Amino acid sequence: MTTEEWYDGLTAELLSQSPFRRSDYFKRFASGTLTREQAWSHIAQHYLLIAWFPRIFSGIHTRCEDFEVRKDCARHLLVEDLGYFEGKVGGTPDHDELFRRIGDDLGYARDGYDRIVAVPEMAAIIAFFRRLAHEVPWSAALCATALLEEEVVEIAQTVGRALVQHYGVRKDWGAMNYTVHEAIEKEESGETKRTILKHLRTADDRRAAEAAMREMHRLLESYAESLARRHPA
């Protein structure tokens, strides 16, 4: 089995169990049976994830000697923090702004984002992000970020569509977060993967990468399950 076959197989396995499709909370989100307050519970927590995500690439950039990997990290930062898209900075709003627009449409004030407190399961994800940025071997850390970016497509296909269909979010405002992320994933498809595969050279590299990807998946599952417990049907 080649490294690419191994990577694609593991990614497919984990995506087939995506908590954003399988969890009771997200099934109810997709069907429109949550209240606005219950829907906001996820949006608010996911904002914390989005706010921390670029810092993984900042951390990897500072400790990686490989120039091509550092360029890939810099590209991610441009996309997340400066809206780089279709070859230009500002091609989209920055990702923090995109998330605040969801709150605009759901009736939550922008300054409220600064007071969001992480639930324990989201705090665990953020703690893992810190480890990815500063401790986990950077090739393994990039594999975990690539898995999370694949999950973004799942989120767009459930949460993004449901916000428009059921919760009064405008396509050209709050829902832009999801259409932009889908478009970015299509544009960037394969870039990070090509960078990663060059550096998964040994069995130990693959073991570290698999451990990081499975831990990312486990934490997302735990988060999704916690939403179902906090907001029972």
Kindly label every feature range from the protein language model:
Residues 1-233:
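Non-heme di-metal
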